[in-house]
Every structure is written in C-alpha cells, then in structure tokens.
Amino acid sequence: MQFESKQIELKNGKIATLRAPRTEDAAALLSCIKQCFGETDFLSRYPDEFNMTVEQEATFLTRALASPSQLMIVCEVDGTIVGNASFQATPLRKMAHRAQVALSICQAFWGLGIGTAMLTALVDAARSAGLSQLELEYVEGNDRGRAIYDKLGFTVYGERPDAIRLADGTSKSEILMVKQL
C-alpha cells in the first residue's frame, strides 16, 4: 500500500519525515527495531530473538510495499530511522474490514509526538483504504502508549492475562483495544 510522505514538527522543534520504507532502508530499519526491543519490555521480543537478515528484511519490505492490505511507515529524524508503524489487514473475506496495528519508537524519541503522528497517519490511511476497524494490543504498564491510543479513540475490549513473561519472571497482561473507523 502506498503512503505519501509528510513532514511533521516535533515537540523539540526538529522536523521529522513520515514516509514509506524503501528496500534500501532494510539495514537501518532492522537496527531501529532491534534497538526498540532492547529499550523496553513493552514489545513482544528481546533483541536476541529478532534475527532477520538484511536480505530477509529487504524481501519483506518489497512484499509489504506491494501488498494492498498492508501499510508500513517509518519516521526519520536527521536522516536516521527512529520509529516505525504498520497495519496489516487479513486476507480472509469475513475479516477483511479489520487490520492489526503495530508501533515502535526508539526511546530517545519518546514524548515528541511521533507516536501520535504515525498512528494518526495509519488511521487516516486505513479509513481511505476502506477498512472499518483497527485493533492493537499493548502490554500493561505502557502508559505512554495507552495515552496515545485513548487520544485517538481506541477503546479497551479485553485483556489477555499472563501474556508476557519477562526474564525476571514477572508476568504482564496484554490489553486489547479497538477503533471503529
């Protein structure tokens, strides 16, 4: 799915670009994703569990960019990818109106408005694509994420207890949210 690039002013005054990733972004995007996995327990993996090669990521990006049911966006600041967001609709006809949302931002860029801007762009694109429902999960305790989701009209519809077990044995629930478009 296509995405038209846009520039946004961050809360710190810097300019960020939201754009579709390119296959040549594979290494930088992998680096960003792996960094995000290491900076927070609010994502699904540890960095050592993410072993995609640059070639595999480039192939994935090529397929994703050609997909009519998937949208990927990266956020670039000063030439560096610092976040990514996506939605993936299901190909099953009975559920083709729904899409799953994912979002991650490097910790140094939290609180600057990137999450809100990327999620707003996803909501607008999903609406334009004819989708009528976006869904996401977040790990309990992710108050920053929850604030963005609430602000953009997502509502809680359930909880998956004991969904995440951290290395120290701590158990966390996933909170399930939905937005009707």
Where are these regions (language model features)?
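Active-site acidic-Proline motif in GNAT/NAT acetyltransferases
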Residues: 103-108, 112, 140-141
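Acetyl-CoA-dependent GNAT
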Residues: 37, 49-98, 102-106, 119-120, ...
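A short beta-loop-alpha structural element at the N-terminal edge
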Residues: 16-31
